[in-house]
Design a protein with these regions (language model features):
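Long alpha-helical, hydrophobic tracts
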Residues: 7, 33-45, 65-79
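Sec-dependent signal peptide recognition
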Residues: 2-10
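Blade-loop segments of beta-propeller domains
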Residues: 78-85, 124
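C-terminal motif of bacterial Sec signal peptides marking the signal peptidase cleavage site
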Residues: 13-16
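Pro/Thr/Ser/Gly-rich low-complexity, intrinsically disordered linker/stalk tracts
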Residues: 18-58, 92, 105-150, 201-231
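Solvent-exposed loop/turn segments flanking beta-strands in beta-repeat/beta-sandwich domains
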Residues: 46-73, 140-169
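Beta-strand-rich modules
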Residues: 60, 85-115, 176-214
Length: 232
């Protein structure tokens, strides 16, 4: 019995030592080498950066620092097992500076490598040009095209008695051919505004239009229930 107990304790001690060795990370203050050979591929609303990783044994990841809007900083990281970073969220096609830094397991950062990206037209802009809003029974119906299946919100606003637009509905979608309806309205003419917004807060140009919803009347089921069928 004592031999079995000693054996079990020995095994547990070996496991504990192994776990300690596995989780122990040597720390230092030596910064890793920077990435090199950076290639930029501009995409709608962003860019893909391909690079050569440094040879540092304790490399942890690569980080990209950039500004989405004036004064709004953002970052994205990629592990040491890949050699590309995808940057998204730009609302315009203006040139931007992106800084790439390598980070090691001691969280030391390399000197930054600066590259220039020039995003293609943002999805919100492209989708916004396809927006349509038409009269529907008891409301309005919106249509839009989203070929890239971007995550978007379609925001519908209506003008109130103070001539101010207020949000009355929002449709969340990633489908290619999107459509949605807002109902519960009378037939009086109404001023609407509709636009696209993405998860970074970028918005398309708004479509403003005046629409009179179609008359809608709830069907009286008692008419059918009260009807008799020949032969009954």
């Amino acid at each position: 019995m004592k031999k079995n107990l000693l054996y079990i304790l020995s095994v547990l001690l070996l496991i504990a030592c192994s776990e300690e060795e596995r989780t122990f990370v040597k720390t230092d203050s030596v910064a890793p080498q920077p990435v090199s050979n950076v290639e930029v591929t501009n995409i709608p609303g962003g860019a893909i950066l391909k690079y050569t990783l440094p040879d540092d044994e304790d490399l942890l990841c690569v980080k990209a620092n950039y500004e989405l809007k004036s004064g709004v900083s953002s970052e994205v990281k990629a592990s040491l097992f890949v050699d590309t970073l995808k940057i998204e969220g730009f609302g315009t096609e203006d040139e931007r500076i992106v800084e790439l830094v390598a980070i090691d397991r001691s969280l030391n950062e390399s000197s930054p490598v600066k590259v220039t990206v020039k995003p293609l037209e943002a999805p919100v802009v492209t989708i916004g040009r396809t927006l349509k809003l038409i009269a529907d029974f008891g409301g309005v119906h919106a249509y839009w095209d989203n070929p890239g299946r971007s995550e978007i919100s379609v925001i519908l606003e209506q003008k109130d008695n103070n001539n101010e637009f207020n949000r009355i509905d929002a449709y969340y979608s990633t489908v290619v051919e999107g459509s949605a309806a807002t109902r519960g309205m009378d037939t009086d003419p109404k001023d609407f505004k509709i636009y696209i917004q993405d998860r970074w807060g970028n918005v398309s140009e708004a479509l403003e239009t005046t629409i009179s919803p179609l008359f809608e009347e709830q069907f009286d089921l008692s008419i059918i229930l009260g009807m008799s069928i020949v032969g009954d």
